[in-house]
């Protein structure tokens, strides 16, 4: 009887553990349209310590077998120069509810990153394939044109319709996202990954259509530089 009981424990307990852990792991890798884009500002005189701590934090993600890809950029041109932007793309809603070991992630983040930065923004976005040219996750190129557009209230539908009408004319990778939480609404973000500054400056084909000018309250255009050592899970272009 004792041996039979041990056999039952050996069969049933692993099955229970699998049932408890498998759904979360499956949800974490489930693809979808949602992205998280966040930004932080290194404290005065602590940029070196921040970058070293952030790299250590990414090592935690690797050890935890995180399946998400994390992009890291420094803002090169814009009023937020030298701030840091990090993002992850292509998640389902269930996936966003199932990050890898969130309590341990937060503990490591507080230890390695938080002492050296001010957290200044964190928002969720939905990718809009009907307005875009690309997959919803930007190519990890050396440069990224990052455009933020705040609309006048009640103009989102007209704005999207105008962009949808011009979608077939897009020539380079152009990714549009609608903010769903985390800032002024309605807000849209356009990402244009490019290999260098020349590709951004010499490309005049991606201007917004004239018919949306009166819908826009504010437009901010920044140029970001990819930080490969401060990114995780990316296959770099040209590598």
Sequence positions of predicted segments:
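Positively charged n-region of N-terminal signal peptides that target proteins for export
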Residues: 1-4
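Bacterial N-terminal signal peptides
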Residues: 8-18
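Short S/T/G/P-rich N-terminal loop/turn motif that feeds into the first structured element of a domain
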Residues: 19-239
């Amino acid at each position: 009887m004792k041996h039979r009981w041990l056999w039952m424990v050996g069969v049933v307990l692993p099955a229970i553990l699998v049932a408890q852990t498998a759904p979360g792991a499956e949800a974490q890798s489930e693809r979808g349209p949602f992205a998280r884009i966040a930004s932080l500002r290194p404290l005065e005189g602590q940029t070196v310590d921040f970058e070293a701590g952030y790299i250590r934090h990414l090592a935690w993600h690797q050890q935890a077998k995180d399946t998400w890809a994390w992009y890291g950029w420094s803002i090169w041109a814009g009023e937020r120069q030298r701030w840091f932007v990090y993002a992850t793309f292509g998640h389902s809603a269930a996936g966003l509810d199932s990050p890898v070991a969130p309590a341990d992630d937060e503990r490591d983040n507080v230890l390695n990153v938080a002492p050296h930065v001010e957290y200044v923004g964190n928002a969720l976005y939905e990718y809009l394939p009907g307005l875009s040219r690309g997959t919803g996750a930007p190519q990890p190129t050396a440069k990224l044109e990052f455009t933020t557009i705040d609309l006048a209230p009640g103009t989102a539908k007209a704005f999207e319709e105008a962009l949808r009408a011009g979608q077939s004319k897009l020539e380079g990778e152009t990714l549009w996202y609608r903010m769903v939480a985390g800032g002024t609404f309605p807000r849209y973000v356009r990402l244009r990954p490019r290999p260098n500054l020349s590709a951004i400056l010499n490309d005049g084909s991606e201007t917004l259509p004239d018919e949306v000018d009166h819908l826009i309250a504010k437009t901010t255009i920044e140029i970001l530089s990819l930080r490969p050592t401060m990114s995780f899970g990316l296959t770099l272009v040209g590598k």
